[in-house]
Regions:
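Solvent-exposed interhelical
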Residues: 92, 147-181, 215-218
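N-terminal beta-alpha supersecondary unit
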Residues: 7-13, 27-52, 166-170
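Acidic (Asp/Glu-rich) catalytic motifs at the cytosolic membrane interface
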Residues: 70-108, 211-230
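Membrane-embedded alpha-helical segments that form the functional core of polytopic membrane enzymes
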Residues: 35-87, 137-140, 194-213
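Structural signal for membrane-spanning alpha-helices in multi-pass inner-membrane proteins
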Residues: 14, 48, 52, 71, ...
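Multi-pass membrane catalytic core of lipid/isoprenoid biosynthesis enzymes
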Residues: 30-48, 89-133, 137-138, 175-188, ...
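C-terminal ends of transmembrane helices
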Residues: 19-25, 78, 97-98, 150-160, ...
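Membrane-proximal soluble regions of multi-pass membrane proteins
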Residues: 1-25
Length: 242
């Protein structure tokens, strides 16, 4: 049990910009840290829903800006960094070895900037076109994406240069993430008639499938790329599917 507690606070400290109340680290809890990503997603989802609620008191364009930026702000733009790195690598259309090298390059290329602008415009337009947004299903969108992230990192073949390449696959963390994903998708559909968490999961899976084929495996950057697009898909489903 202590490894799960360590894993939760390790995940909070690593994947959220909100100050962690207990900064701890235990190497044996690394897999539990990945499995606790959905719990971190719950915190991110609550912040996102709070920003959506606050946006009702702002002019529509400013409210949409707050809603669009909230999931990026709460993570300190961590996953956006992965999104940009993957876009740079994939859109270079070079051989696999070069794409993997570009993925680890700290420089920001033109493809990354263009894709970031398009991503922002899409997310802003989604919320600009929204009426009243149901908050509880929205809370579950980041949970769904991070449950998918935990499953992907703990089951898929990693890129050799990935920080997760030496991590053991399978086990209780995979079961936990799978149960969380199944539970929240079912809960949202049954209680609120919303398939937003399912749409977020579908967006994540498709993005990982594409990036995996282009880059030869799974990595933290690939997960950030897929998570960013998954959250956009979940928000779009919530706003546009009425």
């Amino acid at each position: 049990m202590s490894d799960w507690i360590y894993g939760f606070f390790m995940a909070w400290g690593m994947f959220l910009a909100i100050p962690c109340p207990k900064k701890i680290w235990r190497e044996s809890a690394r897999r539990k840290m990945v499995a606790c990503l959905p719990l971190v997603g719950l915190i991110a989802g609550l912040v996102w829903a709070g920003c959506v609620w606050l946006s009702a008191f702002l002019p529509l364009p400013l409210g949409a800006l707050l809603c669009a930026a909230a999931p990026w702000l709460v993570t300190g733009f961590l996953h956006l960094d992965g999104f940009m790195d993957v876009c740079d690598a994939v859109l270079s259309r070079r051989d696999l070895e070069t794409r993997q090298r570009i993925l680890k390059d700290s420089h920001c290329g033109a493809f990354a900037v263009i894709c970031l602008v398009l991503l922002f415009l899409c997310q802003w337009a989604v919320f600009l076109s929204a009426g009243a947004i149901p908050l509880l299903p929205l809370v579950l969108v980041p949970v769904s994406c991070r449950a998918c992230a935990a499953l992907a990192v703990l089951t898929l073949r990693p890129i050799a240069v990935s920080q997760y390449s030496a991590m053991e696959r399978g086990g209780a963390p995979v079961v936990f993430a799978a149960l969380v994903l199944t539970g929240i998708c079912a809960l949202s559909a049954i209680l609120w008639g919303s398939f937003a968490p399912l749409a977020a999961a579908a967006g994540y899976v498709l993005a990982v499938w594409y990036a995996d084929r282009q880059l030869g495996g799974m990595s933290g950057d690939v997960s950030g790329f897929a998570l960013t697009l998954g959250e956009l898909c979940g928000a779009a489903a919530l706003v546009l599917w009425r």
